Regions:
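Glycine/proline-rich, positively charged
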Residues: 1-59
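Active-site-adjacent beta-strand anchor residues
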Residues: 20-21, 75, 127, 146-149
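Glycine-rich beta-alpha junction loops
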Residues: 23, 49-53, 75-82, 136, ...
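Aromatic-lined glycan-binding groove of carbohydrate-active enzymes
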Residues: 56-93, 128
Length: 204
């Protein structure tokens, strides 16, 4: 497969190649094989990533940053859940994507906590909650592009306007804190070790 993709790049049929929905070890294996054999390597990863679904940060984001891979985000509003139309104590409104297809999988409690934090920020900027969710994504260094799934012209225009929203450092801190993932091993051990190493040595 990698040789076939390489042939397509070398012949000019495609400019860059990317992959989608793979584990970090699979991505790294493909990159390493391409490098070892002088083949065109993957340049991008297409993956699910939202303020309410940051699992990608455990393994894939560090890998992409290290290997200089761009991230193309799919379902940046978690299947419409982060548009703000669905309320914490109610079902998804009729006609919305979530009403007929409850996908992608998301921790709804975390999602609604994020929505609660995004609403006052959206009000302060005079924009929709959806724009804040997209602006947060666009602020992430690893994100190269966001694949939006608007159903109407109004939704499309609203989504596109998110590129003009500039979140302040305080706003980003609030959003990062409310959406932060709990550390799992080896993450908490690496953080602990990093703290020890960063501490200045003391002398008697």
């Amino acid at each position: 497969t990698l040789e076939s993709l390489n042939d397509m790049v070398r012949s000019g049929k495609v400019r860059y190649i990317g992959l989608c929905n793979l584990a970090a070890w699979q991505v790294m294996k493909a990159v390493a094989i391409s490098k070892a054999n002088g083949l065109a390597r993957f340049q991008s990863v297409q993956a699910y990533y939202t303020i309410a679904g940051r699992e990608l940060e455990r393994e894939l984001v560090p890998l992409m940053e290290d290997q200089k891979l761009g991230l193309m985000v799919w379902s940046p509003l978690a299947g419409g859940l982060l548009s703000g139309r669905t309320k914490r104590d109610g079902a998804a409104p009729e006609g919305t994507r979530r009403a007929t297809f409850d996908f992608p999988v998301v921790d709804k409690q975390r999602a609604f906590n994020c929505l609660d934090a995004m609403q006052p920020i959206a009000d302060a900027h005079g924009v929709s909650v959806a724009q804040i969710a997209l602006a947060w994504l666009l602020s992430r260094p690893v994100v190269s592009s966001v694949i939006i799934g608007a159903k109407t012209i109004e939704q499309l225009n609203d989504n596109l306007a998110s590129s003009n929203v500039k979140l302040t450092s305080d706003e980003l801190r609030i959003l990062d804190e409310v959406s932060q993932l709990p550390r799992e091993y080896p993450g908490w051990m690496l953080a602990l070790q990093g703290g020890y190493r960063a501490a200045a040595p003391t002398r008697d």
